[in-house]
Amino acid sequence: MGEAARHPDGDFSDVGNLHAQDVHQALEQHMLVDGYDLVLDLDASSGVWLVDAVTQKRYLDLFSFFASAPLGINPPSIVEDPAFMRELAVAAVNKPSNPDLYSVPYARFVKTFARVLGDPRLPRLFFVDGGALAVENALKAALDWKAQKLGLAEPDTDRLQVLHLERSFHGRSGYTMSLTNTEPSKTARFPKFGWPRISSPALQHPPAEHTGANQEAERRALEAAREAFAAADGMIACFIAEPIQGEGGDNHLSAEFLQAMQRLCHENDALFVLDEVQSGCGITGTAWAYQQLGLQPDLVAFGKKTQVCGVMGGGRIDEVPENVFAVSSRISSTWGGNLADMVRATRLLETIERTQVFDTVVQRGKYFRDGLEDLAARHPSVVTNARGRGLMCAVDLPDTRTRNEVLRLMYTEHQVIALPCGGRSLRFRPALTIAEHEIDQALQALASSVTAVAESV
C-alpha cells in the first residue's frame, strides 16, 4: 500500500504504526529532508553494509555516518552480547549530569579512553556533546590561558585572536564560525571575528613529484604566519589546524609544516591546538594523526568515532595554574557528554584495543591507497591527487560537476556511498574494520563510474 493510500490526509498521529515507506513524508512535514533517499534499517544493517528498509537494497558504506562509526553499524561485540545490551539499555534510561553526579560507567569510560586513546602528555580531559563544542572549548581554554598570561581583563580580552587556515572546517557554533571557511552557506550572515587566516599548504600527491610546489606553498604559508604573529602584537592565543582538512578537501598538511607552526607558536607564546574530530580514533592508523607527524600539541579536540566529543589538554596549558581544566565550571555543560554514548564508546574502545584494529587500518589503508593510485594511473585525465593516511583516503576529479556525477553513479548504479569534499574531491570514510574484498568493491564502483563519466564527455 502506498503512502497516499495509507495516509491520504498526511496524518501520522499513529506513530506506533509508522512504516519505512512513511519516513520521508513524516519528516518533511517538519524538517528539511535533503539527505539520502534510503531509509536505514537499523536491524538488518551490519558492518560496512547499510540496508534500505524500503527496497531491501544493500549499500556499501564508505561514509560511516560522517566518519563517526569506528566499527561500522551493529558491531558484533555490542549486538551479540546480551549482557552488554542490557547494560547499554540501563545507561539509556536516564541522562545524568555527568560533571556533577558520578557513576561507575562514567569512570569506566574515562579510564578506558585514557588507556586506549590517551596521551600521557595530555592528561586533562573534558567531555561534551558535539565536535564543534569540542573545538569551542579548546579555543576557550587557549583564550583563557593567554588572557591570564598577559594579565588581561575585559574589554582588553576582546583583542585576543586565533590564527587558523584557509579551507578549515571547525564547526558551526559561536567561536568556530570565525574559523570555518569551506562553503559560504555555512557561515554567511552570522557575525564573526576577523581573526587572522593564512593559506593552507595542502600537499599535492604524490609528494615526490611535486616537491617544489609543495615547498613553495609551505614557505608562503609560514611567511604569512610570521606576519600574522607580528601584526597581532602578542595577541594570538593559539594556532589551530586539522592535520588533514576533511570537509575542506581532504587536504594533507606535512609534518614539516606543522612542526614549523608549532615552533612559531612556542616562539610567540601561543598554544598549538589540533582539531582531530575527523582524523582521530584510528582512521589514520594511530590513535591520533599527530602521533605520526612528530607533534606535541597543547590541546586536541576530538569527536565522531569517540562517540563522546571533547578536549585533551596538557603541555603548556599548566603554565597557568588556574586554567580552565582546574577551575570549577569555567568550562562545563549540563551532561558533559551522554552516559549511553560513554557506555557504547567503552565497549568500542575495548574492542579496538583487543583486536588491534589500528594495525589493520595501516594495512588496509595502504591497500586502498594503492588501488586509488592505480586508478589514477589508468585515468590520469580524470582521477588525480590520490592520497591517504590509513583509511582516510581521497582523490580529485576535474571539477565539481564531474565529482558529483561520479558520486551519483556510485550510489545509484553500484550502491556505494562515498562523500564529496572541497571543490572537486571525493573522500572515503569507511569503518576501521572494512575488509580487502569490500575495498575491491569500492574501487570497482569508482572505476566503473569514472569510466562512464569519461565516455559521456
Curated annotation (Swiss-Prot):
Optimum pH is 7.0-7.5. Disulfide bonds: none annotated. It comes from the Bacteria. This is L-lysine-epsilon aminotransferase. GO terms for molecular function: L-lysine 6-transaminase activity; pyridoxal phosphate binding. Pyridoxal 5'-phosphate binds at G131, A132, Q278. Its EC number is 2.6.1.36. Monomer. It holds the Pfam family Aminotran_3. 2-oxoglutarate binds at R172, Q278, R427. Its cofactor is pyridoxal 5'-phosphate. Activity is induced in the presence of high concentrations of lysine, but not by L-alpha-aminoadipic acid. Not repressed by ammonium ions. The modification N6-(pyridoxal phosphate)lysine is found at K304. Belongs to the class-III pyridoxal-phosphate-dependent aminotransferase family. The lineage of its organism: Bacteria, Bacillati, Actinomycetota, Actinomycetes, Kitasatosporales. It catalyses: L-lysine + 2-oxoglutarate = (S)-2-amino-6-oxohexanoate + L-glutamate. Pathway: Antibiotic biosynthesis; cephamycin C biosynthesis. Optimum temperature is 30 degrees Celsius. L-lysine binds at R172. Catalyzes the transfer of the terminal amino group of L-lysine to alpha-ketoglutarate to yield L-glutamate and 2-aminoadipate 6-semialdehyde ((S)-2-amino-6-oxohexanoate), which is spontaneously converted to the dehydrated form 1-piperideine 6-carboxylate. Shows a high specificity for L-lysine as substrate although L-ornithine can also be used, leading to the formation of an o-aminobenzaldehyde reactive compound. Only cis-oxaloacetate and pyruvate can replace alpha-ketoglutarate, but with very low efficiency. It is an enzyme of class 2 (transferase). Keywords: Aminotransferase, Antibiotic biosynthesis, Pyridoxal phosphate, Transferase. GO terms for biological process: antibiotic biosynthetic process; gamma-aminobutyric acid catabolic process. SUPFAM superfamilies: PLP-dependent transferases.
